Amino acid sequence: MQESRDIGSPRTASVGIRLLVLLATLLGLAVAPVHATARGAAAPFKVLALYNGTWDAAHINFVHEANEWFPQQAAQNGFTYTASDNWNLLADGGVDEYKVVLFLDDLPQTSAQRAGFERYMRGGGAWMGFHVAAFTTEAQSWPWYHNEFLGTGNFKSNTWGPTTATLKVEDRTHPSTKALPATFTSSVSEWYSWSNDLRQNPDIKILASVDPSSFPLGTDPNQTWYSGYYPILWTNSEYKMLYANFGHNAMDYDTNTPLSSTFASETQNRFLLDGLKWLGGAGGTQSPAAPTSASARTAMSQK
């Protein structure tokens, strides 16, 4: 009988309560880091890639590559990837839900698309463009994009055929290039030059250019660069943007067979991923607000 009374005694109950409290505390310590990690995990940012995909086999092949490569990188790098050939998403506000917009092989063609893109960028959107996204021989038809945003003006020349280039990293403090070596070998591409000297534009920060050790650059003597200064990667400090000169694979045009891959350079891929993370908000800064141009306001009012 005495044993039965001891089990229910205040002293025994007190010990039991203390044990329960200790157990609860230990369980709380074990679970807390999991909840803290879950609360601290950033939601993936959304990326929209716009493409044309209908002209020049090399550009089409790049689009196919990009639409395979970026989704493969998405989960481990904190973003989601959607590809579309509907450029009217720029005109009707369909891009507003995306943190970053990519132009893979073209640029907006209608006034509504152009006005929508300008509004998106001035409103804090982010952009990465490749190769032909800067191509034009009529910069005056969209001066905000070609002269202010990109700073390039008109297309001036290109190399041919597509080759690798040794690139000199000019700014190793920018989030997109801080992990890159002083020089690196690019993937194969055709390379463009433009009428405007980007070095003279105070808003343009050139991140990488053709290293002189690359010359001569090209395989056709009539379309080879033998000397000069050629920007390859840059940003505009007035916007959250990055432009990359590459995006044109070597091709066997007789059989439409690719002879190279834009994503063959691991160092170049590092730029793409670090740049995309910066654009998506990892360590970046807010885009400066800027007034919309008169042409954009007119186009938007006509929607």
Task: Briefly describe each language-model feature range.
Residues 1-15:
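N-terminal secretory signal peptides that target proteins for export/translocation
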Residues 18-30:
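Bacterial N-terminal signal peptides
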Residues 41-45, 50, 61, 69-72, ...:
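Extracellular ligand-binding/catalytic regions of CAZymes and related secreted enzymes
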Residues 46-137:
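Helical hinge/lid and interdomain linker segments adjacent to catalytic or ligand-binding clefts
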Residues 54-55, 89, 108, 134-135, ...:
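Short, solvent-exposed loop/turn segments at secondary-structure junctions
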Residues 66, 103, 107-183:
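A glycine-rich, often tryptophan-bearing local segment used as a flexible ligand/cofactor-contacting loop or short
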Residues 158-243:
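Catalytic beta-strand/loop cores that center a nucleophilic Ser/Cys/Thr
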